[in-house]
């Protein structure tokens, strides 16, 4: 039996159009070999057509998939579609194959996608997980971690950044805002503390007490988190406790 290919589709279709309308009686004039050949050719052509459909679907899906340097998190559905179509071709019993260049493109794009995803996860675990869960609860403990996260984020490619959720970036931004606000508030109080008498054991003058009261008033307005940014909180406490031993 001659091996069929898709180029024989026209001939097989013509044979089917002639064969199918025959009655049972008319078919008796054909030999068993002719019947068998007709059936085998029809089945084989159907298999070839189905294979062609699988190949076209896979190649179409891969063509729509961005290149490895362009692919981002938003292309997950395209990658999933291409993967499913590619697997159907690859796992076909007839050993179907697609255009080698498209197969290579698929492999490189897929590899890049998961590499970017992993880089994003590494950034997340190393930097984002080091941030406070509550953006309003930023203490001096996070003074290095927050800018470090921003620097690391900027260093990521746009591809990798696409795998970082918008909510995560917003949280980082909120932490930065709180850090800036808290440091600014602490600096203002530190400047007032700098005006306090250097020797806490010396007798305080009216001017000293006025400075202590001003510093204490500003200090009292700070949140517990903001107070962690003060450079000389203890000196203020010592001065205040001496000036007001009764509290």
Regions found by a protein language model. Name each.
Residues 1-247:
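Beta-rich interaction/scaffold domains
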């Amino acid at each position: 039996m001659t091996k069929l290919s898709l180029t024989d589709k026209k001939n097989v279709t013509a044979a089917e159009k002639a064969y199918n309308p025959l009655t049972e009686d008319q078919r008796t004039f054909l030999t068993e070999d002719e019947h068998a050949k007709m059936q085998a050719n029809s089945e084989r052509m159907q298999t070839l057509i189905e294979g062609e459909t699988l190949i076209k679907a896979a190649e179409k899906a891969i063509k729509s998939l961005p290149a490895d340097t362009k692919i981002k998190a938003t292309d997950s559905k395209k990658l999933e579609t291409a993967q499913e179509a590619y697997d159907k071709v690859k796992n076909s019993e007839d050993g179907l194959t697609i255009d080698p260049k498209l197969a290579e493109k698929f492999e490189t794009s897929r590899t890049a996608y998961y590499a970017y995803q992993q880089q994003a996860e590494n950034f997340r675990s190393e930097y984002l997980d080091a941030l406070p869960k509550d953006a309003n609860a930023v203490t001096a403990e996070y003074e290095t971690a927050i800018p470090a996260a921003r620097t690391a984020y900027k260093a990521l490619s746009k591809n990798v950044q696409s795998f970082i959720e918008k909510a995560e970036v917003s949280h980082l931004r909120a932490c930065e805002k709180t850090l800036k606000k808290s440091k600014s508030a602490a600096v203002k109080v530190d400047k007032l503390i700098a005006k306090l008498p250097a020797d806490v054991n010396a007798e305080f003058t009216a001017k000293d007490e006025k400075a202590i009261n001003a510093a204490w008033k500003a200090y009292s307005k700070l949140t517990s988190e903001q107070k962690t940014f003060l450079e000389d909180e203890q000196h203020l406490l010592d001065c205040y406790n001496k000036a007001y031993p009764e509290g």
